[in-house]
Amino acid sequence: MSFDISALKVLFKKVFPPKKSIYTVDTNNDGKADSLLIKVLNVIMPILVPKHIELGGFSTKNFDINKFELSDYGKMYLDEFPINVSKKDYDVEKLKGHFKFYLKAEEFTVDDLLSGKLSGRMIALGDTISILIKIDEEGLEKFSEGKHTFKFKSKIIPTLEFNFELGAENLNQKFDPK
């Protein structure tokens, strides 16, 4: 099932500002980027984080990350090139360690999200949710200066697509959780 989400493009540009949503960052203070930082700006309304998230056929209620396969829900692309995140190719525990989430500078892990640790927290209008993803050098090379497109294609929800641009202001920046 595919939907035309062209009406949401304006909203996507506000939630993911093209020059202010994606960064390569240095988390080790060694002067070299080692992670990707995605900033999501809440421009919709205050959001109370629920205990469980349900979207299409996906739910965190009885979620077991060891049985989860993202490719069952959709495929991701960067500049039309597929991004492989199959559990067949990665150790799940190691992969979980590559993701951190920040809300109001407070750090959360994948396990925190799955256990409902964020439940009941308010994401205020204007708040930014930061997603930090540790990526190897080869992966970071794909995030070069210039314009890029990220897509998530699924049969469950409409294709999600957003454009972003990387330049001196968001390449190899020092990580700040705020």
Give names to the regions the model predicted.
Residues S2-K178:
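Terminal leader/tail segments of proteins
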